[in-house]
């Protein structure tokens, strides 16, 4: 018997072929360097859970946003900690979030945006090959959600050959 849960952490689309949806998914896969559509669907399911929780809190508060925020303080703090919401956003902003808001907080995307890699796929490779550290600890999961406080602590591992600024694979050296 295997350990762990055998449940899927995502939902597949209801209709197998919708040209517009497939084109949008392909664009997101390329823009964020995702390995396959399962990663995208997992992120979409995560966003769906956020929206569902926000709707539940607003419903419990009978539409009063300030009461809903008090009920869901931990939920909103978590979204603010990850940088999905800014400090002055209220709970109704959660309903307007897009999947790209979640994808922007992945370690892979942040490594690329900070200029440590020249492409999103190269950022993924650097992470998987243990060249990237967050707060001094190696991270090998490109899908790790990065907190706002951790974003400035992303760097190359000191033992990595990529720590040398003259390394040919470094994004800064290619300019």
Swiss-Prot record:
One example of the protein's molecular function in GO is: rRNA binding
Q: What Gene Ontology cellular component terms go with this record?
A: small ribosomal subunit
Coiled-coil ranges (or none) = none
Its domain of life reads Archaea
Q: Which InterPro entries match?
A: Ribosomal_uS4 (IPR022801), Ribosomal_uS4_arc (IPR022802), Ribosomal_uS4_CS (IPR018079), Ribosomal_uS4_euk/arc (IPR005710), Ribosomal_uS4_N (IPR001912), S4_RNA-bd (IPR002942), S4_RNA-bd_sf (IPR036986)
State the Gene Ontology BP annotations.
ribosomal small subunit biogenesis; translation
What PROSITE patterns is this protein classified in?
RIBOSOMAL_S4 (PS00632), S4 (PS50889)
Q: Which UniProt keywords apply?
A: Ribonucleoprotein, Ribosomal protein, RNA-binding, rRNA-binding
Signal peptide residues are none
Start and end residues of each S4 RNA-binding domain:
105-169
How the protein assembles, per its UniProt entry?
A: Part of the 30S ribosomal subunit. Contacts protein S5. The interaction surface between S4 and S5 is involved in control of translational fidelity.
Q: What does this protein do?
A: One of the primary rRNA binding proteins, it binds directly to 16S rRNA where it nucleates assembly of the body of the 30S subunit. With S5 and S12 plays an important role in translational accuracy.
Query: Which family does the UniProt entry place this protein in?
Result: Belongs to the universal ribosomal protein uS4 family.
User: Under which name does UniProt file this protein?
Assistant: Small ribosomal subunit protein uS4
């Amino acid at each position: 018997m295997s350990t762990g849960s055998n449940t899927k952490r995502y939902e597949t689309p209801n209709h197998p072929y919708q040209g517009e949806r497939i084109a949008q998914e392909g664009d997101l896969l390329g823009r964020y360097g995702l390995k396959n559509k399962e990663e995208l669907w997992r992120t979409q399911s995560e966003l769906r859970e956020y929206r569902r929780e926000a709707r539940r809190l607003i419903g419990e508060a009978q539409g009063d946003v300030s009461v809903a925020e008090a009920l869901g303080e931990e939920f909103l703090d978590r979204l603010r900690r990850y940088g999905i919401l800014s400090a002055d956003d209220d709970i109704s902003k959660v309903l307007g979030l897009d999947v790209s808001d979640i994808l922007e907080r992945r370690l892979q995307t942040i490594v690329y945006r900070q200029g440590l890699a020249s492409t999103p796929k190269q950022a993924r490779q650097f992470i998987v090959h243990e060249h990237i550290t967050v707060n001094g600890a190696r991270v090998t999961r490109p899908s790790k959600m990065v907190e706002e406080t951790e974003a400035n602590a992303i760097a190359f591992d000191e033992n990595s050959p990529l720590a040398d600024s003259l390394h040919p694979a470094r994004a800064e050296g290619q300019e």
